[in-house]
Amino acid sequence: MVAAHPGSSRARELHPSYPVAYAHAAATIRGAERGDVAAQARLGWMYSTGRGVPQDYYEAAKWYYRAANQGHGEAQFALGMLYNKGEGVPRDFVLAYMWLNLSASQAVGENQDFKARMRDAIATKMTVRQVQMAQGLALAWYSSR
């Protein structure tokens, strides 16, 4: 089977919703490039899941980082999970813990409990010194805001 060019009529025939997904992806990319934090987080999710764009964990991490560094809690969580798994970034439990800690600190209710449990699960893979380092990085991140 030969692949169809994304904008071709054959692509639309193979997947009728493609033009809609492509248009949504293009609009999200434009917003993300303009600095829209929600668009950056959404684009990270799109690259992470392969929805509307080819799956690419490196690109997901790049866009999640941009949103996370602006304080977007869900992007912080997603970036932390990428560091935990080593997807698109080198596996780094210190940075995983830091981003999950930042995300958990702004969540509420059950969402906060879930994020704190995920952070604490990562802590079981770390030394006491690494946890202290991650907490210090999170504090430094807050202090720089």
Stretches found by the model and what they are:
Residues G7-S8, I29, E33-D36, T49-R51, ...:
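Short helix-capping/linker turns of helical repeat alpha-solenoids
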Residues S8, Y22-I29, V37, A41, ...:
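Alpha-helical tetratricopeptide repeat
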Residues P16-Y22, D56-Y57:
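Helix-turn-helix repeat elements of alpha-solenoid scaffolds
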Residues R42-T49, V53, A78-K85, S103, ...:
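Hydrophobic face of amphipathic alpha-helices that form TPR/SEL1-like repeat modules
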